[in-house]
Amino acid sequence: MTNRYEGGDLLVEALKHLGVRQIFSVSGGVINSIYSAAATHGMCLVHTRHEAAAAFMAEAVGRQTGVPGVAAVTVGAGVTNTVTPAFVAKRAGTP
């Protein structure tokens, strides 16, 4: 059996290279490969109860540390719920 290298692995490795230590998220369908990769590569997953909370937490981490804050959300309403925190991060120049 061969080891599978998925998109989640590539993403998590790239984030680690940037200094990211945690991903804020609400678990959901199409982003499961990110969770598997995060566990494999030793990245901390912080589960929240709402996508906006995950995105605001990521923005706060970016603002306080200078390291990009990361929120992983699923398609549809998950992305829609991150519009306000993404706008705040953009206006504040948060990484």
Annotate each predicted stretch with a short phrase.
Residues M1-P95:
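N-terminal alpha/beta PP-like core and its mobile active-site loop of ThDP/TPP-dependent enzymes
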